[in-house]
């Protein structure tokens, strides 16, 4: 029974789509979140606190609320659609945008904490050695913040795989286009196909355990932030 579910053509397509979404989202989150985390970690100020609050908002905001407003923003009559010339709702690109916004705090916050834990001294030393700010960032800050980057990448990937409310609101669960594993589990439960739901839910439960274990091992080895 289990093999029949896992190796079903439709299930393999759903699995591939889910992994593709999580991978693309994680790459974009690291590319966008790392410089944002660096900026937030350098000093304070009202604007930085406002941006930090906006970044962390998806942690407490119900996914359906975020998904609802994203659906409106991506709809056919929205200013964003007029600007782009095409709508993002019910498309893979729309899922990526929604996933990046929804998972942003799970990537930015660990990286920001790693930069803060590093302190200003390593960058000051690099400056005395005549390293440019950009060189110092790539050769000093990023290596020392590696544990935060790893934790952020793991959290971002796992959180994207487990998304439900946002992806359902934005994507609608179209097979082969926007239907991911979490939506598939919901469909199985609605149709009373408990065996199939158990297989997928059990797999995601095991993945969540591995993610948390990996984070704990990283923190145990490197501490909560970067190496001193």
From Swiss-Prot:
Q: Which domain of life is it from?
A: Bacteria
A Gene Ontology cellular-component term: plasma membrane
NCBIfam families the UniProt entry points to:
modB_ABC (TIGR02141)
Subunit field text: Homodimer.
Q: Please give the start and end residues of each transmembrane region.
A: 21-41, 54-74, 88-108, 133-153, 154-174, 198-218
* Annotated function: Part of the binding-protein-dependent transport system for molybdenum; probably responsible for the translocation of the substrate across the membrane.
InterPro entries, A to Z: MetI-like, MetI-like_sf, ModB_ABC
- Kindly give the membrane topology term recorded for this protein: Multi-pass membrane protein
- The identity of this protein, by name, is Molybdenum transport system permease protein ModB
What the record says about family reads:
Belongs to the binding-protein-dependent transport system permease family. CysTW subfamily.
Q: Which organism is it from?
A: Rhodobacter capsulatus
Keywords, alphabetical: Cell inner membrane, Cell membrane, Membrane, Molybdenum, Transmembrane, Transmembrane helix, Transport
Cellular location(s): Cell inner membrane
Boundaries of every ABC transmembrane type-1 domain copy:
15-217
Q: List the disulfide bonds.
A: none
GO molecular function per UniProt: molybdate ion transmembrane transporter activity
